[in-house]
Amino acid sequence: MKLTCVVIVAVLFLTAWTFVTAVPHSSNALENLYLKARHEMENPEASKLNTRYDCEPPGNFCGMIKIGPPCCSGWCFFACA
């Protein structure tokens, strides 16, 4: 039981150490990531996650059985809603 706990703690420590040392060489890399995320929260247009280039706009044919890209709205009944 003690050995299992020691192994679990060691794995968690090594995993955390890997993530800490995997940061780019800049001394304020974590701060830059935080500021970028905060900027995207304050300005949703700056976020790349909000844009979908692989979806069909409303009115386009979307198919009966998911032929082609999905609709941007998520609703498909022969044509995107």
From Swiss-Prot:
Name of the featured protein: Omega-conotoxin-like TxO4
Record's keyword terms, sorted: Bromination, Calcium channel impairing toxin, Disulfide bond, Hydroxylation, Ion channel impairing toxin, Knottin, Neurotoxin, Presynaptic neurotoxin, Secreted, Signal, Toxin, Voltage-gated calcium channel impairing toxin
Keyword Secreted annotated: yes
One Gene Ontology molecular-function label: ion channel inhibitor activity
Organism: Conus textile (Cloth-of-gold cone)
Free-text tissue specificity from the UniProt record: Expressed by the venom duct.
Subcellular location: Secreted
Family: Belongs to the conotoxin O1 superfamily.
Residues making up the signal peptide according to the UniProt record: 1-22
6'-bromotryptophan PTM sites in chain numbering: W75
